[in-house]
């Protein structure tokens, strides 16, 4: 077995341990979710497409629903998003995923047809639980994730941006947590993640004020990492995003994935549990091909 083959085997073994530590309950995919799955399947339309660029190690996940719906999630799209996350979790050659919307808009949340059909507390909570689980797994992927925001990211679309490690906006894009106007609060985990990103005071401002966040304000409060020098719908944003993320994914995929795993554990676990996870992940790269190559070619740091 080659050195890369050996380290991949160790990474696969560690992935199981990391998932156990992070308590990612994949059993949710059956049992309690059966009823809501059947109801979501009744609302087709749109798609969640996944393209894996093997050469760069970047995947592009595109949320697509006709322009009139501004890429709102139909029921079937929610199920499809979960399937795409499943695929990304086992992509051993991957380094990053860019989440974008089609046709110059990011996402406007849930399709109103599906929302009206499950407008009762029981179904609403089941849908909430399903999407919380999916977006939590998206954020925990062993890939560096970037939300590429063109046009508008509204409601659940704004929540989707918080399920990525970084957020990039085109110069004319807007993020808005409009839940208050619908008589709601975020239900896909967006509030909890938003507090972690910008703090409770700023999160309270955005949620209670339903304020439109333009790129400058977003960067000022720490929600946005970079403002791209292009406009929505020009067809240039994805190339800009790939260029922006390139320095962060330079190197072998096993090392990039290992870095993401220890950051996730440090963010979500107690110190003792995070240290245990760090030791486990460290063991997958210590003495691995990248480590040995670096020791041979770089005897001293400069």
From Swiss-Prot:
Its EC number is 4.1.1.94. Keywords: Cytoplasm, Lyase. It is an enzyme of class 4 (lyase). It comes from the Eukaryota. Disulfide bonds: none annotated. GO terms for molecular function: carboxy-lyase activity; methyl/ethyl malonyl-CoA decarboxylase activity. This is Ethylmalonyl-CoA decarboxylase. It comes from Danio rerio. The gene is echdc1.
């Amino acid at each position: 077995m080659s050195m890369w083959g050996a380290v991949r085997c160790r990474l696969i073994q560690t992935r199981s341990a990391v998932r156990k530590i992070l308590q990612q309950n994949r059993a949710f995919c059956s049992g309690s979710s059966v009823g809501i799955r059947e109801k979501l399947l009744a609302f087709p339309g749109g798609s969640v497409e996944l393209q894996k660029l093997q050469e760069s190690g970047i995947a592009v996940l595109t949320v697509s629903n006709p322009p009139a719906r501004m890429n709102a999630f139909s029921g079937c799209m929610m199920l499809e998003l979960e399937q795409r996350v499943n695929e990304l979790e086992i992509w051993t050659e991957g380094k990053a995923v860019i989440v974008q919307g089609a046709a110059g808009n990011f996402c406007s949340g849930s399709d109103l047809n599906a929302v009206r059909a499950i407008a009762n507390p029981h179904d609403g909570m089941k849908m909430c639980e399903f999407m919380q689980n999916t977006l939590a797994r998206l954020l925990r992927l062993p890939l560096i994730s970037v939300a590429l925001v063109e046009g508008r990211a509204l409601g659940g679309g704004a929540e989707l941006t918080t399920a990525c490690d970084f957020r990039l906006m085109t110069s004319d894009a807007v993020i808005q947590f409009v839940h208050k106007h619908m008589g709601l609060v975020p239900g896909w985990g967006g509030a909890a993640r938003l507090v972690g990103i910008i703090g409770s005071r700023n999160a309270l401002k955005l949620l209670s004020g339903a304020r439109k966040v333009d790129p400058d304000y977003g960067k000022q409060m720490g929600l946005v990492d970079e403002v791209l020098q292009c406009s929505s719908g020009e067809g240039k944003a994805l190339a800009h995003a790939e260029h922006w993320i390139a320095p962060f994914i330079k190197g072998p995929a096993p090392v990039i994935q290992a870095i993401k795993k220890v950051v996730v554990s440090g963010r979500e676990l107690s110190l003792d549990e995070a240290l245990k996870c760090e030791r486990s992940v460290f063991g997958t790269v210590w003495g691995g091909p990248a480590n040995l190559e670096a020791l041979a070619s770089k005897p001293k740091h400069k």
